[in-house]
Amino acid sequence: MRFFVTGLMRYGYADCVLRTLSAAGHEVFYFPMHEFYTTVSYWKRKLYKMGCSSLRTTHEKAWEEELLARVECQSPDVVLVLNGAMLSLSLAKALSETGHLLVLWLWDGVVRFGQERLRHLLPYLSCVAVFEKADLQLLREYEGAKLYLPLGYDESLYDEAADDVRDIDISFIGMPSEERLAVLDRVAEYAYAAHRTLFVGGTWYDRRFWKRLLFRKRHPVLYPFVENRLLTLEEAAHVYRRSRICLNIGMREHHSVNPRTFELLASGALQIMDAGQDLNGKARRGVDLLQYENMDQMIDFIDYYLADERARQQIACRGQQYNRNRNSMRAVLDELLKELVYP
């Protein structure tokens, strides 16, 4: 099939989708989204804030016109929109009129994307793939193809033959939230008292020095364990593969598993996850990973499985095996293709 893909290049997931489709023998054309705030000059952003709204309108219109011209030139079978950040109603309507299948793959919940916004887009979409399984209920009257499709892991980053030394006892990579900070403060206290190595990656505080000082004051035990920067998928994979235990702490508004779940399973580390995330058959609780009900139980899990390496490896290996043929990006895209070819 011929795919025309558009999306943001953040975090590397779009690149993984492109490589996986190409490796499967599909023709793939990519046109990146250029969001106004991340691509225009500082002065244009300032003028926009001062009321020159036409700057953004002109920017987005020019991007849409170029995308439509490229779609017409490439004549794909499928236009695949990743996450839909710049998918306007006018663009969706224009793409639907070209006769190509128009697929929206959401990488966040419908609540964040906008339920009303999605409702207006639906008449022009051939297929919608959702991040949260519960969001399928919001599409019950939608007559097009729909499926629950969480992001798969990048197989190229988790080569089974690679042999990384597991020199990190506990790791977590992600963005800050109130619940995550509460959990990690507790984990940091445990790691410090038990002389365990802990790695926490992500942008946890602003680069301005007073923000760093404020974070250090509020989280004095956690602070030394934090590497305060955004890690690439490659860097995150290296950390996970070096870890004995990886924590998966979900966001309050999300109920289905996040993409990190499959990356952690693929890494061969033992995954310990909060019980608020529904596995939806993508992994087995107590078999492939552990889920904790409260912080005391989480600390008990960490302490026990760091002390019993054999027990840790048993669960980690089961999770890695179960995950391999079910949750890779290749397997996930196969699900999407089946829905498009045999709806």
Regions found by a protein language model. Give the residues of each.
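Conserved acidic donor-binding segment of nucleotide-sugar-dependent glycosyltransferases
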Residues: 289-295, 304-309
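Proline-aspartate-enriched helix->loop->beta-strand connector
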Residues: 71, 75-77
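Nucleotide-sugar donor-binding catalytic core of glycosyltransferases
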Residues: 1-51, 59-66, 82-83, 89, ...
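Active-site proximal beta-strand in glycosyltransferases
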Residues: 95-109, 129
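A charged, aromatic-enriched C-terminal amphipathic alpha-helix characteristic of glycosyltransferases
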Residues: 307-338
